[in-house]
From Swiss-Prot:
The active site is at 288 (proton acceptor). Keywords: ATP-binding, Magnesium, Manganese, Metal-binding, Nucleotide-binding, Nucleotidyltransferase, Transferase. This is Protein nucleotidyltransferase YdiU. ATP binds at residues 101, 103-104, 123, 135-136, 201, 208, 298. It comes from Moritella marina. Disulfide bonds: none annotated.
Amino acid sequence: MRQKTATITRRDKSFTGHYVPVKPTPIKDPEYVAHSKNLFSELGFADSMAESADFVRMFSGDMSGVPVPMRQVGWASGYALSIYGTEYTQQCPFQTGNGYGDGRAISVLETLIKGQRWEMQLKGGGRTPYCRGADGRAVLRSSIREFLAQDHMHALGVPTSRSLSLYVSKTETVKRPWYSQGSRSENPDMLISEAVAISTRVAPSFIRVGQLELFARRSRSNEHPKAMEELEKIVLHLIDREYADVIDTQLATPEKIVLLAREFRGRLTSMVANWIRVGFCQGNFNSDNCAAGGFTLDYGPFGFCDVFNPYYQPWTGGGNHFSFMNQPNAAQRNFDMFCSALRPLLVSHQQDLLAFDEIQSEFLAVMDTKMKAMWATKLGLINLKTESDKALCNVLIKELQTLMMQAPVDYTIFFRELSSIPDDIGPLKKSFYSNLYNDAADDPDTLALEKYWIEWLEKWQMLLNSTCDAKGISSRASEDIAMQMKLVNPKYVLREWFVMPAYQQATAGDYSLIQELQAVMTQPYAEQSKELEDKYYRLKPLEFFEVGGLSHLSCSS
């Protein structure tokens, strides 16, 4: 929906409109790096298109030659910012919150392909009115991370924006703060020149919770006569783009909003449960990084767990509120801001407002149910028959989380090894970072911990038996459960220490490691070759712990 435009300058104090026309700034001398073969196939594109002159030109930011009826200009959108449920305006150049928005993301195309609507957005396409003094560029390093991550998350079965293509400039660079080799500094300790790149991401829309907040805030403060109308339009546009298949267009607007809240709650809770399932931490889950369509958006300082740690946080500025196991609570704060933004449209519809408030109040209960179901699925306990078995499953989950921290264990490797339903704890040792069973075999604490692991495994095996017939778990049943577990517990995840060599090689024009990672990470549940297993299914080397750019990241991109 682009019914309104807005022109923003440093002097403006109030604004209207849903978008701003922006012409991308092409990168100089673009070179092909990668494209998503899976998405190209879905769209009916030939792989050869990714390196064709017209395609490269457009998706490296040059829209001067686009065919009719396309326009030679894209658009950027404004949004508000809330961090963990608190509204912020401090970094806005106007101190009003009206200066936030797509600082380097420019949408260039909206199209209908095979019945599916897609919006295509350049990331790193140059300055927009929302860049707050920045250059509007993205560097190759961060572009590779996001490109690979979106492809990987889709293959993992996690709702996400999609990667389309990635191009790098052979001659244009910008300076960014980053870490020196082997640095253990919390924040970047040097300034480096990096090649600029443009990646294109694709989704049905890029409407964020923060975008709804922006129009709600304008309505709340009566910034202009059509503020409430613009809020309603952006909400109806969201429904049209993301929820048209589940919300009847003939319903009255208040009824649509109640259904929207219910549907978004379902998508948001499922998405976050999936994040935990695969070990993903978004790192910076502000409302402006929360897609109102209920999918993963904005791969900045994200990371995948190596060692299981509830407080794992890849971003040095993220704090515990965006840490791995607190993501359900962060999601609840974003849902609260979502509801707060929609509520003004219901103030004169009390029955709808009551239903709406009930949906909001039940968020954590729904989230808890999704989380328990997710853990049970990871443990292969999907057919529990009695309430006592379900209660025991919840106890096992809590005990396991404690044991995983005490060992400690590699999150991905542990659950993948457990998926083979081992008879004893031997195979699980592959996931242990502590050398418990060698150097300290006679240590009382080690022996006690080993005893707890054995007891836990026995209780888990007994509960698995209860999901089968009275004769216990058969060989065939065991194989079926193992197969099901291996479909939810990935063997391969995109660890930061896999990605760093890829973007380091890419700076020298060698993209082969990107292609290898793309091939492996788009088949995360497959066994793959012994060579790839030895390379990508292993514990994080000790020398990589606490290293900047490997264990922790800044927002530099």
